[in-house]
Regions:
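Short, well-structured alpha-helical segments that form the helix of a local strand-helix-strand
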Residues: 164-176
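N-terminal mature-domain region immediately after signal-peptide cleavage
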Residues: 1-166, 186, 191
Length: 199
């Protein structure tokens, strides 16, 4: 898929910009499944740096507000947080949606905004799973958590008319996952807000 080609490009750029730092395709591909693997019996049981916070509020005028932090481990990776814009190269690089995250080096992000439609973030949901079950899900093609929002928003950004907020809630409530998480999201209209607990 396209994400594989993008990972190859990121590996190449790391080699050009930081030749003393070895970064491989396999290393970055492992990060694509960080969230899923961190929920397994192979990971530390420590809950340190595994929490994030999302806040949804509505102003008196009905405007929705969505803010979030990113307390995910490892702490040092926060130093590579970027504001990223996903663009369609065939339409004069028109931005489709954007995000702020350090997961950019996986070609996905865990916090995204599609203007006029939705803002969304994932938050850690505690659970320990068998690594065998998670690896079976990965081999079966379950979408990595870090691509859930990207793949939806790529499709939605091309729709005319765009998908509704309620349809986004339904889609993300039913997307097959290999590991649990919370989805915190707000829409563009008054009252459009949801927190989805996924197992």
């Amino acid at each position: 898929p396209i994400e594989s080609l993008e990972l190859d490009t990121i590996v190449h750029e790391f080699h050009v910009l930081f030749p003393e730092q070895y970064v491989s395709f396999n290393y970055l591909a492992g990060w694509v499944y960080f969230h899923e693997l961190a929920h397994t019996d192979l990971a530390s049981n420590s809950s340190v740096w595994r929490e994030c916070t999302g806040l949804l509020a509505q102003s008196a005028d009905g405007s929705m507000h969505h803010v979030a932090n990113m307390d995910q481990s490892p702490p040092a990776v926060r130093n590579v947080t970027l504001h990223v814009r996903f663009v369609n190269g065939s339409t004069a690089r028109k931005p489709l949606f954007e995000g702020v995250d350090w997961y950019w080096f996986t070609t996905g992000t865990s916090r995204m905004v599609l203007p006029g439609v939705v803002s969304v973030q994932e938050n850690w949901r505690f659970s320990q799973l068998s690594h065998k079950v998670v690896l079976q899900d990965i081999q079966a093609g379950v979408v990595p958590q870090i691509y859930v929002f990207r793949r939806s928003l790529e499709r939605v950004a091309a729709m005319n008319p765009p998908i509704t907020f309620d349809e986004m809630v339904d889609e993300w409530s039913n997307t097959r996952l290999a590991a649990p998480f919370y989805i915190v999201m707000a829409g563009a209209k008054s009252g459009e807000a949801a927190i989805i607990a996924r197992n």
